[in-house]
Amino acid sequence: MKRKYLKLMIGLALAATLTLSGCSLPGLSAAADQTIKIGAQSMSESEIIASMLGQLIEHHTDLKTTTIKNLGSNAVQQQALMNGEIDIAATRYTGDALTGTLRMEPEKDPDKALALTQREFKKRYDLKWYDSYGFDNTYAFTVSKELADQYHLETVSDVKKWAPQLKLGVDNYWMKLKGNGYQDFTKTYGMTFGGTYPMQIGLVYDAVKSGKMDIVLAYSTDGRIKSYGLKMLKDDKQFFPPYDCSPVVPEKVLKEHPELEGIIKKMLGKIDTATMQELNYEVDGNLKEPSVVAKEYLEKHRYFES
């Protein structure tokens, strides 16, 4: 009798355990499904934008977000999207997408580049490439304002007359780049410099500020351009392809969470290159956390009120 009673109690306990397990696992899975994973590259710009998206999503919906940081390259982001490791790529650039992911020729017209990228990403990968946030993080030849005033420099072509006596500081990578690198640049603009000095991209800003370099190749959204009083020269021959920045989201994710569409669209076309420079400098120059810079921007522009 005792054995039968013991077996009955064990059976009831097992049944209760299985019932509880069956109830709790779907709950855990559902909770996980309610967390949107936002991918950010290993640079301030990407972390700021990712944080803006995350804060807006959490404020305006019941969804939770987490940021997957340090996605080092265009290829890594693409793979993470395709594998479902991230739900949103916060910052993708048309120039990288066309020549890198899509293996196509660069398109110099910004509108055509965007339209082509959007079409091909939908067709090949079922990914939605949104319109731009409003800024273009491309290469930009940059000089001190003093040098610009001295030689009356407004465009890259204006440099040609003085190039043989100028020292140029450039990114190591750009010297070897095919299609849009140094060799093709000299052919397009018909100029060579008195000296060309490859270095890490982060060093070019101090090099031109200190006068060690006369002209450098910079990233157009870097905050040091403004804080150091530097001047970007217009690429009047459109040598560099556009690198307009957009978020990218799998269509599957948008079907599962249609509320994301309206949130993402709130940010499109709102952040120009000068604004992105300022935001980047808050992180790189004033050493603020990207999440703090993102929140301050969103509060200032009343994103949480609408």
UniProtKB/Swiss-Prot annotation:
Recorded consequence of changing residue 146 to K: In strain: ATCC 6633
Endpoints of the signal sequence: 1-22
Phenotype when changing residue 194 to S: In strain: ATCC 6633
Membrane-spanning residues: none
Conditions for induction: Repressed by GbsR.
Gene3D superfamilies: Osmoprotection protein (prox), domain 2 (3.40.190.120), Periplasmic binding protein-like II (3.40.190.10)
Lipid-binding residues (covalent, S-diacylglycerol cysteine): 23
Lipid attachment in record (N-palmitoyl cysteine): 23
CDD domains xref list: PBP2_OpuCC_like
Keywords: Amino-acid transport, Cell membrane, Lipoprotein, Membrane, Palmitate, Signal, Transport
GO CC term (a single one): ATP-binding cassette (ABC) transporter complex
Localization, UniProt: Cell membrane
Pfam family, one: OpuAC
InterPro entries hit by this protein: ABC_Gly_betaine_transp_sub-bd
Membrane topology: Lipid-anchor
Gene Ontology MF, one: transmembrane transporter activity
GO biological process: amino acid transport; cellular response to sulfate starvation
Protein family per UniProt: Belongs to the OsmX family.
Role this protein plays: Member of a high affinity multicomponent binding-protein-dependent transport system for choline.
Protein name: Choline-binding protein
Organism encoding this protein: Bacillus subtilis (strain 168)
Phylogenetic classification of the source organism: Bacteria, Bacillati, Bacillota, Bacilli, Bacillales
